[in-house]
């Protein structure tokens, strides 16, 4: 399972204050300022993890901060109908996001794909084009896992940009369709 990064919270008011929000038996602090979120962006709520002692393997660790189902080493993700009609949220590939605790990074859907791909993790995972993870505290293990995944209009090999510590790396993830050299996905819905 693949899980997402955490932040000290998710966007909210423009007051600059933080507020605790009870979720899944955990308390998460969601940042509300000064880094205001734009439309299409979300911040991972650190307390929404589903595993506080997650393992990065067999996923590929990218820039030392996040483990993703990157091709060709990981099979393409299977998809199912999301129930959200025929648009860009038509199919969903459920897979967790695994993040290294205490790190800050962004997951970004490149501009050419924003009309057909969204990403999101947490409770609930909000379909977004940019997910911010901001220094989720170490609460047991080095890696934290979050529920969520990828929404897409049609199966494809898609790019995702990871940005951390002044570095950026583009990776490719098979969402319902295999990337070159990647094993085929099970449970694909065209």
Where on the chain are the PLM-derived regions?
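C-terminal motif of bacterial Sec signal peptides marking the signal peptidase cleavage site
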Residues: 3-5
């Amino acid at each position: 399972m693949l899980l997402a990064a955490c932040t000290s919270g998710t966007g909210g008011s423009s007051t600059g204050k933080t507020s605790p929000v009870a979720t899944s038996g955990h308390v998460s602090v969601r940042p509300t300022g000064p880094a205001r979120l734009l439309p299409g962006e979300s911040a991972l709520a650190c307390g929404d993890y589903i595993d506080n002692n997650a393992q990065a393997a067999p996923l590929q660790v990218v820039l030392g901060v996040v483990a993703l189902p990157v091709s060709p080493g990981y099979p393409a993700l299977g998809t199912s109908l999301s129930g959200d009609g025929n648009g860009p949220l038509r199919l969903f590939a459920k897979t967790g996001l695994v993040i290294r605790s205490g790190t800050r990074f962004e997951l970004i859907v490149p501009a050419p794909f924003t009309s057909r791909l969204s990403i999101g993790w947490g409770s609930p995972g909000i379909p977004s084009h940019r997910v911010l993870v901001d220094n989720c505290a170490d609460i047991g293990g080095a890696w934290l896992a979050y529920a969520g995944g990828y929404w897409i209009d049609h199966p494809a090999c898609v790019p995702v940009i990871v940005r951390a510590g002044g570095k950026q790396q583009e990776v490719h993830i098979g969402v319902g369709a295999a990337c070159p050299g990647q094993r085929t996905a099970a449970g694909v819905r065209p």
